Amino acid sequence: VLKSENGQILIKSSAAKSLVASTINSPSQKKKLISQNGVIKLVSNTGTLKAKNIKIDAGENGGVVSSGKIDVSSDNSKAGKIEVTGKEISIQSGSNILAKGAKGGGEILIGGDWQGKGNLLQATYATVEKNTLIDASSTKTGDGGKIVIWSDIKDQDSVTKVNGTLKAKSIDGAGGKIETSGAVINTDGIKVDASSQKGKGGLWLIDPYNYTIGDSEATTIKNQLNSGTNVSILTSQATSNSLSGSSGGYGDITVNTGLTLTGNNDATLTLNAARHITLNSGVKYLDTGSGKLSLAFIAGGNITQNTGGEIAIAKRIEAGKD
């Protein structure tokens, strides 16, 4: 256990000789991290790190592997900030990354900041395995915090894989915001919660080049909307120097599995495609709850409804009053 109750823990690969290994494989198992002066650096955390703020930096060619606990939570104030940076980041099964605060959730930035903004080093590979908990919730008062799992969307090799549990909840404030973004995204089995018990729901943002809503994605999105978490899928269009291959980086959103929503809480579903939105299966909103659902479909190209791709609303509609 490494603790610094009132200060900050900063781990850099150059200074953490006991935490440095010689090689690390990329998620594709086809490439390895680029060497830095002949050495591929790996920062590994298997224990507990506890401080007000924690930074783990493996450098632009290094990697971070964490299977332990990283904690900047506070029992009496707003939680702190966690930054984990490197070329490749792997948060392994059983890990706990916590920024829970009595007066507001903190920030957990893995592989980059929100939408890649700021000066934080951007990862090429960011992985959060199943049975991992990342939590930036508010535990008493205040808003939920911010969680970002990011890999550089401008890099054609960029992959973000998130299969664990992400929370940025609130009790009486607003829910927090959660982003899972990269050129290619895998969110199979992910669990997300940015809801609020008494306040406004938060946001889950998904930002790849292309995105397909299949069985797993539909279940996850449906659960978040029904719990009061807003979901926004924003695709970008690749340049000629970006993604290549048969799938392309066109900026399309495809709905292959239907979404059946009950409206238990107010929420908004936004599909914002740089190119086309294709509905091969529908979106149905049933009148079984007291909440309100807002739908926003925005496309730079076409919105196509194929057979079975209807939008059905079985809900009371009230006209505005003068």
Language model: regions and residue ranges:
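Extracellular and secretory-pathway beta-repeat/beta-biased strand scaffolds
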Residues: 1-322
